[in-house]
């Protein structure tokens, strides 16, 4: 079972619909009882990092997620950023599952990074356009599986142990986005 974590700030209905379209059983919850039963946990998100972490802590989801670190966790957009240690957006601590700091995009192009952009990767399936909406980015590191070029290299997919972060919106990226979401659910992008 796949559980989408509901902390009040997210693109939950679109993500749920996309996962159902792929044929998976999916439940939306913010309770330990349900999240503890998940095989895969999806952390969606749209909004401000500090506000999201405040809600996650208010709902005790940080503790619930911390006791489920043996499970695959997929963060989408803000959800990916929340898995990192810290963000400059609101100078807030994150969940700390992936090492690094989230920082504002530094580019001569307009911010937010909004619209379709091509993925760059050594992975054979990660080479098409996907839909981005964000002003902050993860650091370039050995955990980056794919990135987009937007006046600077912007991490688009990261994988660290059982954590997968997707900065763009696969649920808004058409059939190709759904293929990426399926690959993330099935095992990720390392050692294919």
Curated annotation (Swiss-Prot):
Annotated PANTHER family: IMIDAZOLE GLYCEROL PHOSPHATE SYNTHASE SUBUNIT HISH
Gene Ontology BP, a term: L-histidine biosynthetic process
Gene3D superfamilies: 3.40.50.880
Protein's name in the database: Imidazole glycerol phosphate synthase subunit HisH
Top-level taxon in the UniProt lineage: Bacteria
EC number: 4.3.2.10, 3.5.1.2
Keyword DNA-binding appears in the UniProt entry: no
Example of a GO MF term: glutaminase activity
Short name of one Pfam family: GATase
Sorted UniProt keywords: Amino-acid biosynthesis, Cytoplasm, Glutamine amidotransferase, Histidine biosynthesis, Hydrolase, Lyase
Pathway where this protein functions: Amino-acid biosynthesis; L-histidine biosynthesis; L-histidine from 5-phospho-alpha-D-ribose 1-diphosphate: step 5/9
Domain Glutamine amidotransferase type-1: 1-192
Quaternary context: Heterodimer of HisH and HisF.
Active-site residues from the entry: 77, 169, 171
Classification via PROSITE patterns: GATASE_TYPE_1
């Amino acid at each position: 079972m796949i559980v989408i974590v509901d902390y009040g700030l997210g693109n939950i209905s679109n993500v749920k619909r996309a996962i159902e379209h792929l044929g998976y059983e999916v439940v939306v919850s913010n309770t330990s009882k349900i999240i503890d039963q998940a095989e895969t946990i999806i952390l969606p998100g749209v909004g401000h990092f500090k506000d999201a972490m405040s809600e996650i802590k208010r709902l005790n989801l940080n503790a619930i997620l911390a006791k489920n670190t043996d499970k695959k966790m997929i963060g989408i957009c803000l959800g990916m950023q929340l898995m990192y240690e810290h963000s400059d957006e609101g100078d807030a601590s994150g969940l700390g599952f992936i090492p690094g700091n989230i920082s504002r995009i530094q580019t001569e192009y307009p911010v937010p990074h909004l619209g379709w952009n091509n993925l760059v990767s050594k992975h054979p399936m990660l080479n098409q356009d996907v839909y981005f909406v964000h002003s902050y980015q993860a650091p370039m590191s050995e955990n980056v599986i794919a990135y987009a070029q937007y006046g600077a290299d912007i991490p688009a997919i990261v994988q660290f142990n059982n954590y997968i972060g997707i900065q763009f919106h696969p649920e808004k990226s058409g059939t190709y986005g759904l293929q990426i979401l399926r690959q993330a659910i099935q095992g990720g992008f390392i050692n294919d």
